Regions:
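Sec-dependent N-terminal signal peptides
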Residues: 4-13
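N-terminal signal peptide c-region/cleavage motif recognized by signal peptidases
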Residues: 15-17
Length: 141
């Protein structure tokens, strides 16, 4: 069951329309953060995940040829509580991708949305960026 959960996380990582038309290749992975006896931190491929564990989702893209800018969007699996993303310009959604904005500017009812409310992440890739990477930190619910 834990392995199926890990596979589901990887499958949900990226969903972006028309990436095939742009000549973009995406690779993605799910990693778990481990602490060493000396307090050091390292990540390793996630073979199984347990509640409370910190995970790192990594999405890398590469475009073989120049082209137009495009948007990559990533669903955050419900079983993960989003913490942060490595791209400052990334936008988040708290309503399944219907509306987008910066965390701290979105409202969930009468309160400002928190990282745990995030359901999706998206970012723009410009024509001058032939390759790149985004990492997402989350906690297993």
């Amino acid at each position: 069951m834990k392995l199926a959960f890990t596979a589901a996380c990887a499958a949900a990582l990226v969903s972006s329309a028309a990436l095939a038309d742009t000549g973009v290749e995406l690779t993605r992975g799910v990693y778990v953060e481990r602490r060493g006896p000396d307090g050091s931190r390292a990540i390793e491929p996630a073979n199984a995940l347990a509640p409370g564990e910190r995970v790192v989702l990594i999405v890398e893209w590469r475009r073989a040829r120049g082209g137009r800018p495009y948007t990559v969007s990533s669903a955050i699996p419900r079983s993960l509580a989003f913490q942060r993303a490595s791209l400052d310009g990334a936008q988040v959604s708290i309503d399944g991708g219907r509306s987008w904005g910066q965390l701290g500017m979105l409202r969930a009812g009468n309160r400002i949305a928190s990282p745990e409310d995030v359901t999706h992440l998206r970012w723009q890739v410009g024509p001058a960026q032939p390759r790149g990477r985004v990492t997402v930190a989350a906690i297993v619910r």
